[in-house]
Every structure is written in C-alpha cells, then in structure tokens.
Amino acid sequence: MEHKVTCVLAMVLMLALSSLAQNQEETCAVIPRERINCGFPGVTAQQCKEKGCCFDDSVRGFPWCFRPLVIENQQEEECPF
C-alpha cells in the first residue's frame, strides 16, 4: 500500500512539474566541434545573446557565438502498480 501511495505522489509531482516545462529545453553545453555558428566575426557576447545564441570565447578555432543545443524532454514512464 505504501508503495502505491509513493507512486501516486511521484506521478502528481511529475505532472505538476511537467506542466511548467516545455517539450524542449535548450542548453549552451555544446561540444566545441558540434557548435553551429550563429554570429559574425567580431560579434560581442551581448550581440550574440540578443540573437538567442550562446557565447563562449574560451576555445580557439571554433565558433564563439553558436546555437544552443535543443534537448527533447523524455516521455515519463508509467508507474507500475
């Protein structure tokens, strides 16, 4: 019985949190060789962010202004009870 209650509470919490989240998330944690250029030579961090892109000038030879990585939210697993 206690397991069922825990499962139900977990489901309610997941549903509440999922209503706040979208189907996709974006992150700037992109491997340098996988960056897709989003700027132009000499772009500033502010100009880059205004375009909705990520800025990281710590790695030479790769785009500093690049598109964020889109992560698809995984579907929730059903609670077996």
Swiss-Prot record:
Gene that produces this protein: Tff1
Keywords: Disulfide bond, Growth factor, Pyrrolidone carboxylic acid, Secreted, Signal
Keyword Cytoplasm (UniProt): no
Residue numbers bearing the Pyrrolidone carboxylic acid modification: 22
Domain annotation P-type: ranges: 26-69
Name of the protein this chain belongs to: Trefoil factor 1
Family matches, as InterPro entries: P_trefoil_chordata, P_trefoil_CS, P_trefoil_dom, P_trefoil_dom_sf
Gene3D superfamilies (alphabetical): Spasmolytic Protein, domain 1
GO biological process: cell differentiation; cell population proliferation; maintenance of gastrointestinal epithelium; negative regulation of cell population proliferation; response to immobilization stress; response to iron ion; response to peptide hormone
GO cellular-component term (any): extracellular space
Residues that span the membrane, as ranges: none
Superkingdom of source: Eukaryota
Taxonomic source organism: Rattus norvegicus (Rat)
Reported function: Stabilizer of the mucous gel overlying the gastrointestinal mucosa that provides a physical barrier against various noxious agents.
Subcellular localization: Secreted
Top-level taxonomy: Eukaryota, Metazoa, Chordata, Craniata, Vertebrata
Signal sequence interval, chain numbering: 1-21
SS bond list: 28-54, 38-53, 48-65
GO MF assignments: growth factor activity
SMART domains xref list: PD
